[in-house]
């Protein structure tokens, strides 16, 4: 039986590191007060435990989740971890402990706080990815298509398959300027590149500027002034996306 302890787990912020926190929790038969990653290190009244990332332990936990708890729980945990909200780690840990105690069917018990928390985390990530599939605007840069996004959550893994399937013959780069990671596709190679301190994309080609002017003119020409409804537009297309959209960036 695990007991609640006034201790904080420190980890490196990676998914593998989080899995090692799950391992640590079970090894010590305890539930920590919280789980923080090193980049947000701050003072606390509670003692801290540095949880080192061990790939062997991480793989053991991952294998256990998939084999004992099933794909639904696995995807809920993976998507929940992509969420950018603070405190996601302890909520995911409590969720996993409930699943191991009650079995994978407990994942459908959305009335349980542990389940509701993770459903909310995963849903927020999925919703933002769905929005970005609609709102991403590519520009021609240095012989390939480039786009910038500013998401709250780390959604690039959920955009990868969509855009690779949608543009099978195009080289492209999608840069997440909040997490400093780019999804890059060149030919058959698809990978992620992390940048320290950010990445400044090259300016669009001159031909691209011409196309953008034409697109803006077309967008404005379609508008019916009498039916303009700014509140409704922001409901369907939140303003935080506008700065990276060709037709709306001037209004952002």
Task: Describe each region flagged by the PLM.
Residues 2-55:
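N-terminal ordered "arm"
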Residues 36-130:
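Charged, alpha-helical interface segments at or near domain boundaries
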